[in-house]
Amino acid sequence: MFWKGPVFTRDGFQGRGLELKDCEIVDKLDGPEDGVIVPLFRNCHTHLGDTLARDAVPEGLSLSELVGPSGWKHKWLANNDVGVSIRAGMKEIITSGTGLVMDFREGGKAGLDTFDDMEYPGTLVLLGRPEKDEGLPGDNAGISSLADVGSMATDLVRQARERKGLVGIHHSENEHEDVRAVIELEPDFLVHMCHATDDDLESVKSAGISIVVCPRSNSYFGNLPPLDKMVDLGIDIGFGTDNGMLCTANMLDEIRFVRQEFDSVDLQQILSIACFGLDDMFNKD
């Protein structure tokens, strides 16, 4: 059995179809093409717990008022069934062809436990954050920002490294932050970087740190990441849909938005980020 159409790979589009039994690209097929064939997408940054808050988000709130430690989102999470909300987000992920999702999971160990009975055929990477005096839940650390957690960040990174986990940190999302402090922590990736300077990006590239950008979510607050500069520098980039209350977890929606807002970035480059995002990070020894 064959799917007919050019196959998107790390080296761009190749062949005229895909033989399904052995997943081999073929160069010659009779008849018209059915479309294009792309790998499953990677959604490299989500907050799925607030998905069902989408129709309830108040207008006019600032970033800190909406998602800060004492913001509206956390009050909503405390008064609603987060597990049901996560399932709604996972449904969007599964039905939009996403094979990997990385969720920053609020709520400490209890927050991570909401995924225990989730059925997802792809790869699920959960990055936890502690509640109150709790230690790091799970193996991976999803840090909101250095401004939020302060010196606790060092301990969270240490715990994740002891467990051979990943470390991701929100940075320069709504205003410029000192990149030197976050580089010293040696995270695997940073999220957002909307207000990063050229020097910041060059420092991140030199440090071998990856970046996940969430353009649709950022645009809600009037921000956009300097994606074109990141691409020019050859930074290892991933796309994320961020908060479910602001954006669908559908990567096709993210791709369309990026294509619309960043016309200087080649479409095949956009597809490559969507399909093979954070390749360098995942393939590190």
Model-assigned labels for residue ranges:
Residues K4-R10, I86-I93, S210, P215-Y220, ...:
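C-terminal helical cap
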Residues G12-K21:
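A conserved glycine-rich beta-strand in the N-terminal activation segment of trypsin-fold
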Residues C23, I237-T241, R256, C275-D285:
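Structural signature of the urease/amidohydrolase superfamily beta/alpha-barrel
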Residues T51-V84, E175, R180-L185, A207-S210, ...:
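Active-site gating loops and adjacent loop-to-helix segments of metal-dependent hydrolytic enzymes
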Residues G60, E119-P121, L185-P187, M230-D232, ...:
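Short, hinge-like loop/turn segments at secondary-structure boundaries
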Residues K75-D155:
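Active-site loop-helix segments enriched in His/Asp/Glu that coordinate
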Residues E134-M245, S264:
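Active-site core of metal-dependent hydrolases
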